[in-house]
């Protein structure tokens, strides 16, 4: 039987009594974002809205985006990527489980030197596929041309952010390429593997701030 989204206590600044909020809203207050599903317009708009709010609240305090996604909509993924580049704070990306297709594109969009994969994470890249239309015959050519433009756009971003030459990116995008965390680091999609001793400890040990007593919430 599903248990729904867990709720945790949260004490608003200046309040004596805690209220129960869903765990993701609590974590958002700590600037921890989660992409744990297929990339679609709904989750993209949620993530973009949260990033814009946090950017307005403090445009210098780092955000952390945890990713476990099989990919999804190309346009929605590009929107999240662009929002990550737009906001003032660094966005650290952390891959847990799988970052495939647009999931890997968003992973790669984190702040350079702050893109991380956990030791057993998997990363996959391939060329974009899209469907704007409902199969109308007269629109097929139009869609094919748009997909080619998106493919070139995504390939250029991969080239710029991984350091790989264009021929390697286009070759690898022609098929599904799966990588381990270490292979993704060698490829340039991530900068650190979770067990790497150079990984910043603060990325992993922000949890005490979630459990702080009344004093921390009232500062």
From Swiss-Prot:
Cleaves peptides in various proteins in a process that requires ATP hydrolysis. Has a chymotrypsin-like activity. Plays a major role in the degradation of misfolded proteins. It catalyses: Hydrolysis of proteins to small peptides in the presence of ATP and magnesium. alpha-casein is the usual test substrate. In the absence of ATP, only oligopeptides shorter than five residues are hydrolyzed (such as succinyl-Leu-Tyr-|-NHMec, and Leu-Tyr-Leu-|-Tyr-Trp, in which cleavage of the -Tyr-|-Leu- and -Tyr-|-Trp bonds also occurs). GO terms for biological process: protein quality control for misfolded or incompletely synthesized proteins. One of its GO terms (molecular function) is ATPase binding. Component of the chloroplastic Clp protease core complex. This is ATP-dependent Clp protease proteolytic subunit. It is found in: Plastid, Chloroplast stroma. The active site is at residues 101, 126. InterPro entries: ClpP, ClpP/crotonase-like_dom_sf, ClpP/TepA, ClpP_His_AS, ClpP_Ser_AS. The gene is clpP. One of its GO terms (cellular component) is endopeptidase Clp complex. Keywords: Chloroplast, Hydrolase, Plastid, Protease, Serine protease. Belongs to the peptidase S14 family. Pfam families: CLP_protease.
């Amino acid at each position: 039987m599903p248990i729904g989204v867990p709720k945790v206590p949260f004490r608003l600044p200046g309040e004596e009594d805690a209220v129960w909020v869903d765990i993701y809203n609590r974590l958002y207050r700590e600037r921890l974002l989660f992409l744990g599903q297929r990339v679609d317009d709904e989750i993209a708009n949620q993530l973009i809205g949260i990033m814009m709010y946090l950017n307005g609240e403090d445009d210098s305090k780092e955000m952390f985006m945890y990713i476990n996604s099989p990919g999804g909509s190309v346009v929605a993924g590009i929107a999240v990527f662009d929002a990550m580049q737009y906001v003032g704070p660094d966005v650290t990306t952390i891959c847990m489980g799988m970052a495939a297709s647009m999931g890997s594109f968003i992973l790669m969009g984190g702040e350079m030197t702050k893109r991380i994969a956990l030791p057993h994470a998997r990363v996959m890249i391939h060329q974009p596929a899209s469907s704007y239309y409902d199969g109308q015959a007269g629109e097929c050519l139009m869609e094919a041309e748009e997909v080619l433009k998106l493919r070139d756009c995504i390939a250029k971003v991969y080239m710029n952010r991984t350091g790989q030459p264009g021929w390697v990116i286009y070759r690898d995008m022609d098929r599904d390429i799966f990588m381990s965390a270490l292979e993704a680091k060698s490829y340039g999609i991530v900068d650190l593997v979770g067990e790497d001793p150079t990984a910043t400890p603060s990325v992993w040990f922000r949890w005490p701030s979630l459990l702080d007593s009344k004093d921390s919430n009232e500062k």
